[in-house]
């Protein structure tokens, strides 16, 4: 007599083995616009060439390189979704996610610092602050 497992498995037709895409497991690249792909590529180039070597040094010396945060601002990574009139890049949340993904590939600590600055500091000022507060604080934080 066949076991339950044997009966269930005999009813399943053999299929071709599924291929897993280790580079893009969620098929994200195919869903992005050309502009989003270019932004992601630019963020990747910065993170791999400029951020990674310095993060390794910061880890070795147990320091936090504050200059990296300034460079995040110069590249529009800080407050990326904040409108340009307040010093942000005026990007979409998808764009912000793509930037965060590239920073995260290098280091969670710097991605967290970027996210805290953008989401917990800048966004509340933009969303709930007065016009005077927005113009006073946001450009300096970006």
PLM feature spans:
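Intrinsic disorder at enzyme termini
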Residues: 1-35
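Glycine-rich flavin
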Residues: 38, 45, 50-142
């Amino acid at each position: 007599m066949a076991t339950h497992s044997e009966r269930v498995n005999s009813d399943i037709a053999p299929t071709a083995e599924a291929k897993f895409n280790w580079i893009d497991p969620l098929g994200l690249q195919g869903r992005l616009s050309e502009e989003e792909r270019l932004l992601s590529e630019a963020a990747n180039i910065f993170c791999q060439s400029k951020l990674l070597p310095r993060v390794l040094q910061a880890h070795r010396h147990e320091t936090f390189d504050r200059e990296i945060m300034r460079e995040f601002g110069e590249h529009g990574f800080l407050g990326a979704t904040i409108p340009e009139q307040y010093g942000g890049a005026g990007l979409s949340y998808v764009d912000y996610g793509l930037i965060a993904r590239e920073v995260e590939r290098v280091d969670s600590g710097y991605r967290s610092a970027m996210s805290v600055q953008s989401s917990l500091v800048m966004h509340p000022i933009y969303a709930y602050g007065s016009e005077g507060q927005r113009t006073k604080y946001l450009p300096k934080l970006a």
